[in-house]
Amino acid sequence: MASNTPRPTKAERRAAARAKAKALREEQERRERRAKITRRSLLGAATVVVVGAGAGLVVYSRKNTVVGNSFPGVAEADGSVTFGAPLTPGTSNDGAPVLDVFFDYSCHFCAAFDTLHTEEITTLLRDGRITLALRPCKILGQNWTDIVMNGMGLVLDQQPDTALDFHNAAFSLFSEIYNSQDGNRLTVDELASTAKSTGVSGSIVDAFNKTVKDNSYGTWTETGTGTFKDKGLQSTPTVLLDGTQLDLQTLSTETALTEAVDGLAGGASGTPAPGDDG
């Protein structure tokens, strides 16, 4: 007999995301102690390397060294892209604190963070309470990061009004693939299908393959990665509010960022970001 079990509601999915985020934080504490050593090992490893919590999920080749010169017109010189109340790139909310999110599109912790806080961040933006600065980088060495960065670069340049939705959908897709451990789905076609679902036009989606093949936005990726390293950061996601690094353990609920913003006026505690003056 066919199952009539309904699909999980949005509330149920977000509750599951909260539970997963808690588990991931505990795992992250263990993994971050090994992170520096692991990344150094990858740099000196064989031409084809397997990394990730689920061995075999992602395979990348170090010989893919093509770097294109395209740079999104709305991106800042450091590679970041800001969003204000209109939810379009290159905008900001005057006088509002900046929420900086450093991430790698191949980071499942980043995907869990994004899934949990998507609606909250959208509300804070629309209410003019923050300016969001997305700060993509490539620290895990994965081809998937290049695929999404090139797709995102194209969307930012050609259909920017869909960029934030595309960003969130790309993370949602990665979470789904990561949880299924089906690395065969980490393809341009999967990303293209996701892009269409967020309203990206067919003509732009059709250009994904060539853009990825040419690594057209490779310079943008390298710039964001350089910014991450120059600031002395160690892992993703790294989240700053008004220049102060937030403890990920305090961000496990879907209202945690709002509470942090509320606390700014009262002198909320935090850690000054590495590389900043204070």
Residue ranges and their predicted role:
Residues 106-108, 246-247:
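Short strand->helix junction
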Residues 101-104, 233:
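Processing junctions and N-termini across compartments
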Residues 70-79, 275-278:
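C-terminal low-complexity, acidic/polar tails when present
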Residues 95, 103-105, 111-193:
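Structural alpha/beta surface segment adjacent to cysteine/selenocysteine redox centers
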Residues 54-75:
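C-terminal region of N-terminal signal peptides and the immediate post-cleavage residues
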Residues 40-59:
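N-terminal export signals
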Residues 78-97:
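A short beta-strand-turn-helix
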Residues 2-34, 38-40, 60, 64, ...:
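C-terminal cap of thioredoxin/glutaredoxin-like
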